[in-house]
Amino acid sequence: MAGISSDSRAKVLAELESVLPTATAQLARELFSVLAVVDSSAGLRRALTDPSREGKDKAALLSSLVRGKVSAQAEQIVDSLAKERWASARDLGDALETVAATVAIAVAENEAPGAEGLEKLENDLFVFNQTVAANHQVQRALSEPQASAEAKQKLASALVPGASQVAELLIGQAVAAPRGARPAKLVEQFATLAAARQQRWIATVTVGQALNKNQEARLSAGLNNLYGRDLKVNISVDPTLIGGVRVRVGDEVVDASVVNRLGELRRQLAG
């Protein structure tokens, strides 16, 4: 995805965070249904990614096609997507697919404490892909162009008995509308999104010397308070840090190590 599209997707995903704590599977389904509308018309995709059109005009166009068919919340999300700039028509669809999948993944995240819901989701997606990989007949059935989406979804559901609601939703989307990819490849992409989401629940802490139990407990409590959720804290020792601590939670890194502060000082002196 080109730089301008990547920036637009990042902006929309950042705005989406406020919705995710109360996300529903129905919202994800609605967003996937809008994706089907966008994918159904090359002319619509060109209009929505035309750099000469105002963002509000593009949003109005898409809204006119989905209003009354999806919730106001879904319409607001796709409006935000349509207003952004996209390097290609494909990029808009890919971003909408990512947004819909992220909403679904958030449902799994909200259903169980900590990262349990995400772990269950990842496992269900993994089991599906392993089952498909081991059976060429299933692979052919899922890629058969004459088979209906409903038939493919029914087969996919039978491959992972006991799968979560969200896993069934994402797997069903992958087999019904793979958008030019192999269904298993799209499921793998969804699993990667879930894994990235799960990293928000893991704090990787590096310290210069080993901590005692009391220090570990205080560190965990402080991180949980800082991030507002119960994190799984993994602590490792790296003597080269000399002192201080380095913390990674998801994409965020806080480096308060002595070696980092010395490096900053050297850069300031060199400047």
Curated annotation (Swiss-Prot):
Keywords: ATP synthesis, Cell membrane, CF(1), Hydrogen ion transport, Ion transport, Membrane, Transport. One of its GO terms (molecular function) is proton-transporting ATP synthase activity, rotational mechanism. Pfam families: OSCP (PF00213). It is found in: Cell membrane. The keyword Membrane applies. GO terms for cellular component: plasma membrane; proton-transporting ATP synthase complex. It comes from the Bacteria. It is a peripheral membrane protein. The keyword Repeat does not apply. NCBIfam families: ATP_synt_delta (TIGR01145), PRK13430.1 (NF009967). Belongs to the ATPase delta chain family. F(1)F(0) ATP synthase produces ATP from ADP in the presence of a proton or sodium gradient. F-type ATPases consist of two structural domains, F(1) containing the extramembraneous catalytic core and F(0) containing the membrane proton channel, linked together by a central stalk and a peripheral stalk. During catalysis, ATP synthesis in the catalytic domain of F(1) is coupled via a rotary mechanism of the central stalk subunits to proton translocation. This protein is part of the stalk that links CF(0) to CF(1). It either transmits conformational changes from CF(0) to CF(1) or is implicated in proton conduction. F-type ATPases have 2 components, F(1) - the catalytic core - and F(0) - the membrane proton channel. F(1) has five subunits: alpha(3), beta(3), gamma(1), delta(1), epsilon(1). F(0) has three main subunits: a(1), b(2) and c(10-14). The alpha and beta chains form an alternating ring which encloses part of the gamma chain. F(1) is attached to F(0) by a central stalk formed by the gamma and epsilon chains, while a peripheral stalk is formed by the delta and b chains. This is ATP synthase subunit delta. It comes from Renibacterium salmoninarum (strain ATCC 33209 / DSM 20767 / JCM 11484 / NBRC 15589 / NCIMB 2235).
